[in-house]
Amino acid sequence: LQERLNAEVVLTRTDDTFISLEERTALANEHQADVFVSIHANSSRIRSVSGVETYYLNFATTLDAQEVAARENVSTGRNIRELPDLVKSITKADKSAESRELANILQKRLYRSAQRLFPETKNRGVRTAPFVVLIGADMPSVLAEVGFVSNPRDEKLLKRVDSRKRLAEALYAGIEGYMKSLGSMEVQASNRAKGSAP
C-alpha cells in the first residue's frame, strides 16, 4: 500500500502485544485513516467449518455472525448489550454504506486468492455483526476473517508464509479496488449534482 498507492499505512501492532479493541479503533481515528481493516483468523467449534468472510458493522443477521462477534468481543469484558455507542455508530448511514462497499470488494479479492491456494475454499460472503473493534470508527471499516484456525487445512495454509503473502496481496487488491471505486462514485455524484447522466 505504501509503495503502490503512496498510502500511509498505520499498523495497530507489529507483534503479539495486546492492544484493546477500542484502542485499535481510536488509533485509526487519531490518524484520520481513510479505511480501517481489521484482519483476523476465525475459529469454530465445528472443525470442518472453513473459508473466508468479511464483516462490516451492523446488527448480526445470522447465529454464526453473532457467535463470531461474541468471540471477538470477549476481550473487552463487556456484553454487546452494554455497548451504548453501538446504536449511535450504526446510525452513521454513510459510513455503513461505504463499509458495505469496502467489504464487498475485499471479500471478492480474498475469496479469489484463497481459492487459488485451495480450490475447495468456501466463500462465506459478506456479513454484518456488532464487532467492538469497528464501533466508533470514523471511516469505512471492516473485519476480514482470512480462514479458520480451528480447521486443520485452513490452519496449515495460514502457517505458510506464501499463503499469508497471497492473502495480504488480496487485501491490498481489495483496498486498491475500493479506493478506485471512490473515484468513480465521486464522478457519478458530481454528474448527478450537475444534472447530467452518469
Regions found by a protein language model. Name each.
Residues 1-198:
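Active-site-proximal helix/loop segments of hydrolytic enzymes
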